[in-house]
Amino acid sequence: YTDYREMLEKENLDGVTISTPDHTHANISKAAMEKGIHVYVQKPLTHNVKEARMLTELARKNKIVTQMGNQGASNPEQKMIQKWIKDGRIGKVHTVHTWTNRPVWAQGSPMPNPDPSQKPEGMDWDLWIGPAKNNGYTPGLHAFSWRGYWDYGTGSLGDMGCHIMDVPIKALGMFEPYSIEASVPRTPYVADYTPAPIYDDSCPPSSYVTYKFRPSKLNDSPVKLIWMDGGLRPSHPEIITDKDDIGENGVLMIGENGLIWSDNYGINARLYINGVEGVVEKGKISEINAVEFGHQKYWVDAIRDGYGSEKYNNLTSNFDFAGPLSEIVLLGNAAIRSSLLKRSPRSNVFIGKKQLLYDSKNMVITNLDRANQYLTCLLYTSDAADESS
């Protein structure tokens, strides 16, 4: 099949896996769940915040067995990290650093020009483009570089945030950031004193996002969570010896009494305690292929036993978790895009780094109305511009 709607109509399916570009996740998932078909959806769950909330609520309503494809959630080392936090090994956590070496595709570059003459034989471009704006077949978007353009992808944060932020979000039980702000470097320079232009339709080559969370039941302290991509990394903690490189991807959870460091997916987790030299405790490096297989198998097993069964409740990234996690990730993208808004229609000055205050219950950014367009990915067409509303 090339048209998922035809497949859902003709086949008697128990479940489907959805590994299409980000901008089509919601439509395909919704169509399947409305027919009672269970879904496994790649990360991020959706292209924007409101789609993630919609799918989460629909899964509950229709009693659908769900799983998002952040396979590290089923890594046994994550249970160990959660126990370290629960047992108070590093005290109250106050700061979390998360980072990735992405992008490994084009970002910060202009959208390629459409050229229908280059469309591969047999490709249905209209079906691939789905709900996004259709300018005609555009070389370079399919099959990979769509990730770097806002109409189709969600950039480095969308691609890796659910793999990396998954670890601290679950361990600390923090699901509703009240503040998000972002800054985007303007490099490289294309000529003397002339920075490269910023393209509205392209995700930036790097970003720095700060989330703030209130104390939770699992961690009685406010937390600042920092996301970095495009080569940005946190300072190397003194407690970690120089021979242990924190790497190009990872998580640092810093508490009163020490820190926890892990790689992508929560693998290679290590516990450090202030005043104690070296690693106090560490996990066995997981075979990520085995973890991924288990993550998918758990979803199949839960389908067999049914919604609400013990196996369903043991799923590590059903939409009750994956939905809020994806919302957090996608709020970071809203902050990134908002920082690149002009202060007014006639201004060449960007808003820049601005704290966005978020009402999670109502899915509204309360202090910059123009930022709300990025929760639904609608184009902002009003000529009015007010920096504070």
Give each language-model segment a name.
Residues 3, 24-27, 50, 54, ...:
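Extracytoplasmic/secreted proteins, especially bacterial periplasmic and envelope-associated proteins
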Residues 1, 19-25, 45-47, 52, ...:
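Short, solvent-exposed turn/loop segments enriched in Gly/Ser/Thr/Pro and often Arg
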Residues 121-307, 315-318, 324-335, 340, ...:
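Glycine-rich, aromatic-lined ligand/substrate-binding cores of catalytic
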Residues 380-387:
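Conserved small/polar residues in nucleotide/adenosyl-binding loops
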Residues 1-54:
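Beta-loop-alpha module in the N-terminal Rossmann-like domain of NAD(P)-dependent dehydrogenases
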Residues 17-18, 40-41, 47, 66-68, ...:
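Structural recognition of the beta-strand scaffold that forms the well-ordered cores
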Residues 361-379:
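A cross-kingdom feature marking charged/low-complexity
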Residues 38-40, 45-122, 127:
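A contiguous active-site-proximal alpha/beta segment in oxidoreductase catalytic domains
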